[in-house]
Amino acid sequence: MLYEKFEYNINNLIGNFGLSKISIAVSGGSDSVALLYLANIWAEKNNIELFVISVDHNLREQSKQETHYIQNISNSLNRKHYSLSFYHQNNFSNLQERAREGRYDLMTNLCLELDILVLLTAHHEDDYVENFCLRLERNSGIFGLSSSNINWYNNIQIIRPLYNIPKSKLVEYLVRHNIKWFEDESNSSDKYRRNVIRQKLAKGADYIRHFSKPVYREEFKGDTERSTAAYTLVREDASTGTASKLSLEAKCGKMSKAAIISQQLKTNKLIENEFKPELISAIAEAVKIFEYGFAFLDLVKFDKFSNEVKVQIINFLLIIISGQSRVARFYSVEPILKLITQDVNFKNTLHGCIIKRIQNELLIYREFGKKLPESKILLDKSVIWDNRFCITKNQETPNCFVTHLSLKDYKIIKKQLDLEPLKNLSCKNHNAVLLTLPIIKILEKVIAIPHISYYDNDMWNFEVSFSPNFVSRFTHFC
């Protein structure tokens, strides 16, 4: 039965956390409505408080009805419901991605306020299949093709207990129990490639890949044991132990839903057993991240790891140092990897960072000047600035705000600054790093630069920590 499978999944995913409360994302579609009823049964059995969260993206007239419907269901189940709104501000550029990020920002921030550690979402088996196909068409590597049933966002654990349950079973459950749900009209539009894939697979047809990009990444030819995920999986299945470029295209060009699920499981197994442990080892061995918001990569140690892991390490550092949430595309990272192999010093910019080779190390620090971080007023006790630093005031300091150091301000206070520790740690790149650090000002006057212990008055006391909101499916550090 459906509930028994759900119960087995969620108990395995959550483990022995001893949770007293949990949250669930519900939109009004069949997937999330079914999840709500299943989770409600499980929560009652385990004496767990269930909080229901809906997000209105203000894009469809029907969304208001959906939110109201979920509120009514929540009330009937005696569960607390929270309705949140995402405002696109009439900016429709890359809207789907921005809406997704906005939705998760809203939901996880609410979880933090409510002291909830886990958020359930209704990603089911068909979603995983569609994602695999879309990533295959983007020529993703093995990390990109893999999937996970547990993710992290804003230090909230995102759990997907429907991962091995097809949508048809969820719909059957709702019909059997006479439960209403809403259909999003955009899901039937051929405008989105995901919908085309979904409709074909729903009819039992094979998935036929669109070859809009090269199938085989040439730079991985030398990695004889492991290369891109598709290539690796073909090698595993081939009786001869080898696979030509032609056979790769044939294998990935046409696949049934069952074959896609099989490939997905093999990919996940390879990630979990080999690549993920290697990535964690690589970060531990080759990476040093400093409280000043810059990092060094040991290129001698870096060289021993596989190409796919190297890409992940560079992206890991770019996200951490830039404060951005999106990873850089492979075609952007590739030139950096090629430069590293040439064994010459260089200086490049990428993803809001400066990447500078200094002999056998790679220094990565925040690019300054292209897009300056916004100033933040210190109204509360603490504030996050530049998506990277948490600044806390330990006394009442009226009218102060956090910003960056301008060249004008630097010239005024230059002689009062002790930059020797920063100079030594950054291999004499202290001036560039200094301009990326948070400073506290009152009106036009710099009153504190906590990183270098500069205060214009002994009464000031601020704490600062490097706390980037890092999001990854493969590593998580609170």
Swiss-Prot record:
Its main location: cytoplasm. It comes from the Bacteria. The keyword Cytoplasm applies. GO terms for molecular function: ATP binding; tRNA(Ile)-lysidine synthase activity. GO terms for biological process: tRNA modification. It is an enzyme of class 6 (ligase). Pfam families: ATP_bind_3. CDD domains: TilS_N (cd01992). Keywords: ATP-binding, Cytoplasm, Ligase, Nucleotide-binding, tRNA processing. GO terms for cellular component: cytoplasm. It is found in: Cytoplasm. Its EC number is 6.3.4.19. It catalyses: cytidine(34) in tRNA(Ile2) + L-lysine + ATP = lysidine(34) in tRNA(Ile2) + AMP + diphosphate + H(+). NCBIfam families: lysidine_TilS_N, RPE1. Ligates lysine onto the cytidine present at position 34 of the AUA codon-specific tRNA(Ile) that contains the anticodon CAU, in an ATP-dependent manner. Cytidine is converted to lysidine, thus changing the amino acid specificity of the tRNA from methionine to isoleucine. This is tRNA(Ile)-lysidine synthase. It comes from Rickettsia africae (strain ESF-5). The gene is tilS.
